[in-house]
Amino acid sequence: MNSVPLLELSGPPRARGITHGRALAGRLRGFLDDSLARLGHLADRPVDLDSLRPSIAAHRDVVAAALPDLAEEVDGLAAGVGVDRDAAWLLQLRREVLGYSRVTAGDCTTYASVRGRPVLAQTVDLNGNLDDQIAVLAVSGPRHRSLVLSFAGLLGYLGVNDAGIAIGLNLVLGGEWEPGVPPYLAIRHVLDSADSVDQAVEILCELPLASSRSFMICGEERAVCVESLGSQRSILEDADLAHTNHFLDPDFAERDEINVFAKNSSRRRLEAVREAGIPDASDTASHHRLLSTPPILVPDNGDIRRERTVAAVILRPDLGEIRLWPGDPSTAEGQVHSLQQWSASGSHR
């Protein structure tokens, strides 16, 4: 199993970024040197940093206006790694740079339930062989402490905070992707700032997002899904929710850009969750079995361009806990990180 670093990030924004960057400097420099953060392996055309600088700058300007603390943290990341500022920003924008690239097998299956004790769980399906780039960030933010799953220098991906808010995500394809706040930074801002499900939803509705996504939010009593398409948002709420990679809102579904093969995969995975039912929050074995069994598990076929399951998580907003299987969850050893452990001892197991 690949070692998963646990990084404690505290202090002012730039200091948090520097700590993150220094801790992973060798790994992130190697990643950036691998065909420009592996984008050269994934894109349909050659890529180089100089050609991407105007797009990176346009996104950075929006982020700096909307989320200045996180913009400063990205700049700190660059200093900590010892790389070009634009390279650190590229790490936050890889998905946006790829744009509407092929999505053929999966790109996360996510579900949440508040029927009993609250739980949010999901697979992380990515291309680029990113299971060697996983880290867990223990962040002391401006308002809340949080545990954040990160890949390849991302400031955010999914996680849980000490206000009892868990958030996950799914890729959906639609609308015009344009300079804005990348959804991963939006998730980090939610974890830093949100006191409640309502506030998390409000944040996601107000931010100028760069690309389409579906966000799953689970509090101690409510589960809500926010679908984002351009400047529009659709809110779904139920005691049990599941989402894959096609829009569920009927109006958004008419503008879905997912290809037919990916949509078939997305539907199969969604039906698999619905047919199995969401296990009780404390039934770790049943969650693990669901997350590590096809079609929800997307196996590796050896093609770096194809999405595969590179991690699976169970988030417990009531416990402030992430249970993580890094890599293929059917073979990976699980590990638990909790805010309570961090508060008590300053470390995790």
Q: Which residues does each predicted region cover?
A:
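C-terminal, well-structured catalytic/ligand-binding subdomain of enzymes
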Residues: 1-81, 114-349
